[in-house]
Amino acid sequence: MEAQQILNNVFGYNTFRTGQEEIINTLLSKKNILAVMPTGAGKSLCYQIPALLFSRGSIIVSPLVALMDDQILSLKELGVSAERIHSHLSEEQNNKTLQDFKKGLIKILYLSPENLMSDRTLYALQDIDIAMFAIDEAHCISKWGASFRPQYEELSKLSQIFPDAIIASFTATADKNTRDDIVHKLCNYNAKIFVQGFDRPNLSLAVEQKTKNWKEQLLIFLENKKNNSGIIYCLSRKETESVADFLNKKTFNAIPYHAGQDAILRKNNQNKFMNEDGIIIVATIAFGMGIDKSNVRFVAHTSLPSSIEAYYQEIGRAGRDGNPAETLLLYGLNDLFQRRRFIELDKSDDQHKLGENKRLDSLLAYCEAPICRKKALLSYFDEEIESCNNCDNCLQPPKMLEGTELAQMALSAIYRSGQVFGAVHIINILLGENSPKIIERGHNKIKTFGIGKEHSKDFWQGFIRQMLASGHITINIKKFGCLQITTTGVQLLKNELQFNYKEIELKSHKTTKNYKEKIPLNIQDSDLELLAALKKLRLTISKSLSVPAFVIFSDASLIEMAKLKPKDQIDFSKINGVGPSKLKKYSDTFLSVING
């Protein structure tokens, strides 16, 4: 049997997506690979199809239990002999699974890196001829990456312990340094690298200065989205609860998700989000990696992510079905201070902290870039594209203004107050605020006191952010977040450099100009009623089987059913995502709704 037959007869798809076939054929020729593929490009098929064609068993390394469980449920629905081993299962179950894999009864076995590299598992696998190790989220092995995990580094031993096994590594986010590090550690540079590109044309990007009324900014972004699924990322557990409560009072259907919740509640909230439409999950970064919900229509951040890689991964959870999806990032000076503080408090070595700070600098530069958001984002991954004409900067190009004198005001306030105060104090000096701290320090008597009072506090926050992004000032976390002047800042203060800044918009309703009234799903209004009925049927079946709804059929398959309206089993078998197993199980039930 060939790859095309597996695609048609097992997975129920007619054609491969871009790049899939070449990766699969390379693996079938027994060569190691690293595939960098954007979210939603279908990377799981790239290792699942070869695993079914190899005569021996394959092991998939996955970091999350939830992801393993979902993948196994999906594969079993297709009639594939697949299993997983993890700590949430009993020792008896795990032992039986391992024995079945050794006997050849299981073709695909999912393991976490910790489980795989344990002495016990390696001992059990030592006499097995394993065809392939497929490593998902492979960027976690690299110290160059933003998501380095020590347990992933142990995987570098696989090529020595199992020299005949193919190593297939997959990731959605890896710049050149990270890619080189992955193939060095996993394959000693003996791998073919596939880089499909990082662009997600269906995503629209926007960044806004976070105001005091940032929840109202969020509310405006959510206009016309009440029936859509979305994710809102917050920095703290407390904030997730607060935002979810705020949205529920505004008649949205929002649920919080964070590591501090009871495990059962957290699991129930995740299942609700996965199985139902119109749910907004308000989460910390504990949520998301490996979440396979295709119809997430928006992702919003209420504060700064940790890096460009983290931001790219998190917004990548929107629009996996290829339909338009929106993203919004709100951030302010305090977010930047918090992120710098997190890095400083981390127990990692100085080199790692330096790398984390550089990644944060890159994200800050992206946020303040006056050019196309997609151009700015993808340039970080060494990819050049034309302007997207779909982000806030393309739809409303920002004005660039001459700001040398304003910059000198801020720099002078920092210098004259001794470079030992944070942004709040510096802004109070510029505004001429007679606060107790200002008076106590005598800063109401320095020349720059009140020199910037014709501008607002929000303006100065945005302006100082741009100066930070330009590298003229820096935040010294070791000295309690004080602002300090850099070498280029000194040159600017001495009039040896000029400074232009992006016009600072302080309107909280800016968002409404950037977003379309309705997200098109490429389906006629007359078919929406049938689509709703098919989704209802899917939910009923999924609940009866205790599996996520997407395991039954993806949204894309349901949309195709609603549009094409298959009359019989032959027509139904032509729907993408309908293989022999699902045809047998579900065709009669779904056809009765379609033709009823």
Residue ranges and their predicted role:
Residues M1-A3, G355-N357, E384-G596:
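Accessory DNA-binding and partner-docking regions appended to nucleic-acid-acting proteins
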